[in-house]
Amino acid sequence: MASNRQFRVGPSYVANAAANILNGTVTSLAGTTPVSLFVAPVIYVKHITLTNKTAGGVTCTLYVGATAGSAGGTEIMGQGQTIAANSSIEKFFAGSGLRMDAVDFLTGVAGAATSIVFEAEIEAGFQ
């Protein structure tokens, strides 16, 4: 059985309206195959960096939950925190990382468009 693979996600902007950033859904297993795959994708988020590339402070919040979600209580990073001009904040997840199954979406909202850059290190595999 193959082991998990490590990937870098981003850089990409965090939108100024709730939008999906990361999800591990397999959209197609199309093709001819003699076996059925009884596995589901899983992502382990190890590290996230949010960088403000502007000359002024900008708020940002990341969430885990439904697609394009920003429900209270699902915040995982930022929680409306102002990221100082030309600065970054980081979050490291302990153990094997923040587990995200196929139904989980990492979403985000920034206080201004094209201001906050998202980057992450993840490990992806199948369960």
Residue ranges and their predicted role:
Residues 50-55, 111:
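Short solvent-exposed strand-capping/beta-turn motif centered on an Asx-Ser/Thr pair
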Residues 70-103:
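Intrinsically disordered, low-complexity Pro/Gly/Ser/Thr-rich segments with frequent PxxP/GP/PP motifs
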